[in-house]
Structures are given as structure tokens and as C-alpha cells.
Amino acid sequence: DTLAWLEQAVPRIRRQYSIKEDGKAILGGYSLAGLFALWAATQTDALYGVAAASPSVWFPGWSEYEAAHPIQAQRVYLSLGDREEHTKNQTMAAVGDNIRALHSALIQRGKACTLEWNAGGHFKDADLRTARAFAWVMEGKR
């Protein structure tokens, strides 16, 4: 439902604010919102970039899903706290391996992608990390 709403809202916003059709749409978020942004990029080619700060790529089945339905965005920012994968919960501990694998796959597919490691756990500096994610996607550098 959220993706369908976005697909209707973006053209409406472009018209309302006279944004050129070739304006670059970026979707992003932190944690589960970061995972949603990555998932949305598997569903549409309307996104130029994804800013996924500490995305919940530990989610069961995500890696297999993305491999079968590749992310279509041109630019993808990924980040993770360097303590996030060090947890007793085996499902969530997969986040480190999963984000490394996603980063490698995106690079192999020719996407502009970076993986930034941040000091601390999942909840450290979420606001700053999210801002850095959007800034990287908007800068347009490899």
C-alpha cells in the first residue's frame, strides 16, 4: 500500500511544485524503513537512488528475494554499525554478512554503491547516519 501511494504521490508532487520529469527520486530510511526503501527499489525503476542507513537486511528471506528481484536504483548507500552483527540473536547476527553480500552484488551489477561502517550499535547516531546516506546519494559521486 505504501509503495502504491508513493507511485501516485510522486507524479502529483512533481506537477504541484513544477519539478522536471527527469528530477531524481530518492527513497531512504533507517532500519526497517531502510529495508522498505531497498525493497521498493526491487519493485520499480522510478527510483534514482536509495539511502539505506542500517537497513534490516537480517530479515529472513531478504537476500534471496533481492537476488531474484534485483534492486533497480542506480545509486545505493548502505551503512551498518560495527557492533550490529555482534548479537546472540542468530537471525539478527546475519545482518553483517547480508549487507556485505548485498554491497558486493550491487557493485558486480555496476551500481554506484557504498557501504559505510559506523562506530557503535544500531541505535547510535541514527539521525546523522540517515543524513549522510541521503547526502551521498544526492552528491552523485562513486
Give, region by region, the residue ranges found by the protein language model:
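Alpha/beta-hydrolase active-site loop
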Residues: 1-16
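Alpha-helical elements of Rossmann-like donor-binding domains used by nucleotide-donor carbohydrate transfer enzymes
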Residues: 5-8, 101, 128, 132
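Short helix-loop-beta connector
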Residues: 20-23
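Gly/Ala-rich beta-loop-alpha elbow adjacent to hydrolase catalytic centers
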Residues: 28-33, 37
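Conserved hydrolase catalytic core segment
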Residues: 39-48
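A short, hydrophobic beta-strand element of the alpha/beta-hydrolase
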Residues: 51-53
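The feature captures the conserved acid-bearing segment of alpha/beta-hydrolase catalytic domains
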Residues: 56-125
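Catalytic active-site module of serine/aspartate enzymes centered on a nucleophile-bearing elbow/loop
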Residues: 130-142
